[in-house]
Amino acid sequence: MTDVVPTTALSEIQLRLLCHDDIDRIKVLCGEWFPIEYPDSWYHDITSNKKFFSLAATFRGGIVGMIVAEIKSRTKVHKEDGDILASSFPVDTQVAYILSLGVVKEFRKHGIGSLLLDSLKEHISTTAQDHCKAIYLHVLTTNNTAIHFYENRDFKQHHYLPYYYSIRGVLKDGFTYVLYINGGHPPWTIFDYIHHIGSALASLSPCSIPQRIYRQAQNLLRSFLPWSGISSKSGIEYSRTM
């Protein structure tokens, strides 16, 4: 790929789905972009399995960027990220997991990464519609370039994952980053409950305060004491899948 990239490169970018014939090229690119070695089965899956959204950005016929994501049920989220969504969401609620997003070095800062991410969002809106409540990913704590990219696009750090990666036999820490969409949100903290109750009280008329306080207190107690006599929804078990 040429080192000379025109300033109008984005206008010449075309998007298409990855296919089996791209495997050799994306193996080279992933080797340049990521410190993790993916097995051959991974490349086969992302280019043939319809459960993956695998999109290539091409410039004059050559791949210069790609994004790979999977839209799945919240019950398929790995254990360490099981609390991405509040338990109040139905079990069939979906999330999107970004497995890979990369752009050839010479083509960075031309908007290609944003184009790929926006294409994923558009795909979600047309397939999962409003059933998908979050987009999330994992990143090395030392990958400041990627962290800044996602933070500038409203992703928030959700978890610190010590020793999450094994890179050439060395354990490395990671972060989980999440972008909430379509009304998605994480489990509430005690401060969220206090803020919610305070906002509710501020909007009440004086004569309705006693009943409203009782209902708010009952809901708060239910959230913290699921073993009490107050009925509560059962928790969801999360399984690790690939």
Swiss-Prot record:
Residues the record marks as active site: Y97, H138
Entry's EC annotation: 2.3.1.259, 2.3.1.48
Stretches assigned to the Cytoplasmic side: 1-192, 237-242
Record field: intramembrane: 193-236
A GO term, aspect molecular function: histone acetyltransferase activity
Residues the record lists as binding acetyl-CoA: L101, G102, V103, K109, H110, G111, I112, G113, S114, N143, Y150, E151, N152, R153
Entry membrane topology: Peripheral membrane protein
GO biological process terms held by the UniProt record: cell population proliferation; chromosome segregation; N-terminal peptidyl-methionine acetylation; N-terminal protein amino acid acetylation; nucleosome assembly
Annotated binding of substrate, by residue: Y38, L99, Y165
Entry keywords, A to Z: Acyltransferase, Chromatin regulator, Chromosome partition, Golgi apparatus, Membrane, Transferase
Domain N-acetyltransferase, first and last residues per copy: 13-182
Reaction equations catalysed: N-terminal L-methionyl-[transmembrane protein] + acetyl-CoA = N-terminal N(alpha)-acetyl-L-methionyl-[transmembrane protein] + CoA + H(+); L-lysyl-[protein] + acetyl-CoA = N(6)-acetyl-L-lysyl-[protein] + CoA + H(+)
Subcellular location: Golgi apparatus membrane
Region annotated Required for homodimerization, chain positions: 162-173
Gene Ontology cellular component annotations, sorted alphabetically: Golgi membrane
Pfam families: Acetyltransf_1 (PF00583)
Function: N-alpha-acetyltransferase that specifically mediates the acetylation of N-terminal residues of the transmembrane proteins, with a strong preference for N-termini facing the cytosol. Displays N-terminal acetyltransferase activity towards a range of N-terminal sequences including those starting with Met-Lys, Met-Val, Met-Ala and Met-Met. Required for normal chromosomal segregation during anaphase. May also show histone acetyltransferase activity; such results are however unclear in vivo and would require additional experimental evidences.
Protein family membership: Belongs to the acetyltransferase family. NAA60 subfamily.
Subunit architecture: Monomer and homodimer; monomer in presence of substrate and homodimer in its absence.
Name the record gives this protein: N-alpha-acetyltransferase 60
Organism expressing this protein natively: Danio rerio
